[in-house]
Amino acid sequence: GIPVEALRKIGAAISTAPADFNVNPKIVRQLKAKAAMFETGEGIDWATGEALGFGSLLLEKHRVRLSGEDCQRGTFSQRHAVLIDQVNQNTYAPLNNIDPAQGVFEVYNSLLSEFGVLGFEYGYSLADPNALVLWEGQFGDFANGAQVIIDQFIASGETKWLRMSGLVLLLPPGYEGPGPEPSSAPL
């Protein structure tokens, strides 16, 4: 498992912002709620568990790369991996501030071109197989535009070219998403 001290270090990083950073009051409440989760050890939600997982990899000096239409905030306003200063629009990524010797955390809000973005991330995962590369589909049937990449590269690339990809697809709606084909990226 992950050492308790590492979890505390990650928890401190993801529940605070620099003193001179003007955080939106709603986000301040969320950061305080995260801090309370770490104090009590109770109520750890999905987004916090995700951040702990990413943070543990970063402390092991791995690169973590996440892209998708609304990844910085999170499709359901749950992640807040990048905070935005309400006065000057500067950004702050808590997961890049755990330890000076950590790996790099990259999180990109992409354009709504699933075919292009997922194709790029697939290529990135092949170029850097030691990185955790994730693509998050937006809520709704937005993985359908990427289905060719899923079928022709991700699902069959190892068989075709003997190249494995560790690309992770995060598909928030699962089978309950709205639309005519709510299965969101069947393999």
Regions found by a protein language model. Give the residues of each.
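Flexible, glycine-rich loop/tail regions that form catalytic "lids" or insertion modules at the edges
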Residues: G1-L187
